[in-house]
Regions:
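Short, hydrophobic/amphipathic alpha-helical patches that form generic packing surfaces
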Residues: 26-30, 74-82, 111-118, 143-147
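Exposed alpha-helical structural elements
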Residues: 5, 9, 20, 24, ...
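Extended alpha-helical scaffolding segments
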Residues: 94-100, 105-187
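Hydrophobic transmembrane alpha-helix bundles
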Residues: 17-46, 55-65, 127-135, 143-151, ...
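Amphipathic alpha-helical substructures
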Residues: 1-37, 92-108, 115, 122, ...
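Long, His/Glu/Asp-enriched segments that create or flank divalent metal/ion-associated functional microenvironments
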Residues: 28-107, 137
Length: 187
């Protein structure tokens, strides 16, 4: 199937000429970016998470966040909406309330550990070490090492962990992380 064949099929079997124009098939199929006639999507679940983020950013305690039934996607939305810089006490409150440093969900833990690295939240570093030495997926480990490599303290930590974890990683991950850390095997 090609784009041309798909458009021809749509014109022949699915849509009237008026619908083809209204839908703007040409733009959807052949133009870059999002078409002008896209229908905005509203997620009630994410709106509820956004409300919790707003309350937390205003100083509300983590215990006030109603997250018991959140899915992984809601957690990722929440963590992604947090500010870049967060005070250690606020991080500790989130971590204590939701055990984010040891969540057991790789997606959530990865997002949390990136926040912990960015804010030098040391209570999460044992969990970071465990994550990097037990989780080999490049999509998780490479960004964490890259985040660590942005600071002197992080680079030292990354090298220490990587020296131990490197033999367990897939060769593609090793190639990526070697470049990120400037690994030469002697460190």
């Amino acid at each position: 199937m090609t784009s041309d064949r798909m458009v021809a099929y749509m014109k022949q079997k699915l849509f009237t000429p008026e619908e083809v124009q209204k839908i703007n098939v040409q733009e959807w199929v052949y133009q870059p970016g999002v078409p002008a006639n896209i229908v905005p999507v509203h997620s009630a679940a994410f709106a509820a998470v956004d409300s919790q983020v707003t309350t937390w950013k205003a100083g509300g305690p983590a215990s006030g966040i109603h997250a018991a039934k959140w899915s992984t996607h809601e957690w990722l939305h929440f963590l992604g909406a947090l500010p870049d810089t967060i005070a250690e006490a606020r991080l500790a409150d989130l971590d204590k309330t939701f055990r984010l440093s040891s969540s057991g969900n790789s997606e959530i833990e990865f997002a949390w550990l990136r926040i912990a690295i960015r804010n030098h939240y040391t209570p999460a570093f044992a969990g970071l070490d465990h994550f990097l030495t037990s989780q080999g997926r490049r999509k998780f480990v490479a960004p964490l090492y890259a985040d660590l490599a942005k600071t002197d303290w992080g680079k030292r930590m990354a090298m220490d962990i990587y020296k131990r974890a490197r033999p367990t990683y897939h060769s593609v991950a090793v190639g990526t992380i070697d470049k990120s850390l400037g690994w030469n095997g002697a460190k």
